[in-house]
Amino acid sequence: MTTPARLAIVIAIAASFAAAQSLDFATYRAKVEPIFLKKREGHARCVVCHAGAGNAFRLQPLDPGATNWTEEESRKNFEAVSRLVNSANLLSSPILKHPLAGTAGGDDFHSGGRQFQSKNDPDWKTIADWARGSQSK
């Protein structure tokens, strides 16, 4: 591998790490995390498949009877979801690309179906805004 190629890889890794450091937990908890609990017509809630999952998008299981996560559980979810944000190329972020319809730029890696039919879906936009660094107001 050439030196410029190695440098490009190091820069991309550093940018992703910096983005993960700059993502806002309060915004995540108030605006993004509720999306994972939301029932979408024709789909299971994200938490149903991703609680305790063995993949990168692993959400904490909800306690019996709970309708939300505790702050500690939310922080663990935040850490897992933050790793799915690619700040160097936001639209290639797995958290945005996997559940998006192929016709809107998504991919085939989400076995839970196309949760978002377009980038205009309000929930997709909420996740994208958070990934860009928007903060809760």
Q: PLM features: residue spans?
A:
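A ubiquitous, low-specificity "background" feature that marks scattered single residues
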Residues: 9-12, 129
